[in-house]
Curated annotation (Swiss-Prot):
This is Alpha-conotoxin SI. Residues 1-21 form the signal peptide. GO terms for cellular component: extracellular region; host cell postsynaptic membrane. Disulfide bonds join 51-56, 52-62. Belongs to the conotoxin A superfamily. Residues 22-49 form a propeptide. Keywords: Acetylcholine receptor inhibiting toxin, Amidation, Disulfide bond, Ion channel impairing toxin, Neurotoxin, Postsynaptic neurotoxin, Secreted, Signal, Toxin.
């Protein structure tokens, strides 16, 4: 392969990697925001003893 062809392949790989990484970054940010949200199910359980998150365990009811 010539230098132009190798450079073109390199640019395509960099571009493809950049395009693929953007949606996964946004999705993880959304999950982080949900986890940090003060009104999440587990945070509500401290005040109302109602939790719809399975991680709360049998101690709390869902209340839905």
């Amino acid at each position: 392969m010539g230098m132009r062809m190798m450079f073109t392949v390199f640019l395509l790989v960099v571009l493809a990697t950049t395009v693929v990484s953007f949606p996964s970054d946004r999705a993880s940010d959304g999950r982080d925001d949900e986890a940090k949200d003060e009104r999440s199910d587990m945070h509500e359980s401290d005040r109302k003893e109602i939790c719809c998150n399975p991680a709360c365990g049998p101690k709390y009811s869902c209340g839905r």
